[in-house]
From Swiss-Prot:
Gene: MT-ND6
Enzyme nomenclature, EC number: 7.1.1.2
InterPro entries with a match to the protein in the record: ComplexI_Subunit6, NADH_UbQ/plastoQ_OxRdtase_su6, Nuo/plastoQ_OxRdtase_6_NuoJ
Transmembrane portions of the chain: 1-21, 27-47, 48-68, 87-107, 139-159
Organism: Struthio camelus
Entry keywords, A to Z: Electron transport, Membrane, Mitochondrion, NAD, Respiratory chain, Translocase, Transmembrane, Transmembrane helix, Transport, Ubiquinone
Record-level GO cellular component terms: mitochondrial membrane
Catalysis performed (reactions): a ubiquinone + NADH + 5 H(+)(in) = a ubiquinol + NAD(+) + 4 H(+)(out)
Protein name per its UniProtKB record: NADH-ubiquinone oxidoreductase chain 6
Length: 173
């Protein structure tokens, strides 16, 4: 289980590097999907399956919206791929920054914190994510209404910015 969680962490870092070094929106969404799948798998290994599933659905829904907007705004006839030299050098630089951060964190002693997985805690009467679901539906309702209103407002702002003089996303057919 430990090696699997370490593998998930390694894949999460690779997904973040893929997002940071994306040459075009077509390839950046692949890094986002890898990062979300691996991050939710990491949460699943910690024993919070409901929150992992909810975050996975939210991530994929949000990423599809972002992907559609970014592709419609930056439609390149010849997009750069990850194999071009500029992107490879940038990706290698990001991996080196991550490795330096790991070495410095190990030297300072940041990595001495330990989190147990599902196997560590044994059998419990109430799982952590089930009590979180109760709070999610009771105290979190107002927060989610405010967050939904903010996202709707953001959607209208982005649509208005995209429209400009050429009536980009909002057109009369």
């Amino acid at each position: 289980m430990t090696y699997f969680v370490m593998f998930l962490g390694f894949c999460f870092i690779l997904g973040a590097v893929a997002v940071a070094s994306n040459p075009s929106p077509y390839y950046g969404v692949l890094g986002l999907v890898v990062g979300s799948v691996v991050g939710c798998g990491w949460l699943l290994s910690l024993g919070v399956s409901f929150i992992s599933l909810a975050l996975f659905l939210v991530y994929l829904g949000g990423m599809l919206v972002v992907f559609v907007y970014s592709v419609s705004l930056a439609a390149d006839p010849y997009p750069q791929a990850w194999g071009s030299w500029q992107v490879v050098i940038y990706g290698v630089g990001l991996v080196l920054v991550v490795l330096v951060g790991i070495v410095v964190g190990d030297f300072v002693g940041v990595w001495n914190l330990w989190v147990g997985t599902v196997d560590y805690g044994g059998l419990g009467a109430v799982r952590l994510d089930f009590s979180g679901v109760a709070l999610f539906y009771s105290w979190g309702a107002g927060l989610f209404l405010v967050a939904g209103w903010g996202l709707l407002l953001t959607l209208f702002v982005v649509l208005e910015l995209v429209r400009g003089l050429s009536r980009g996303a909002i057109r009369a057919v």
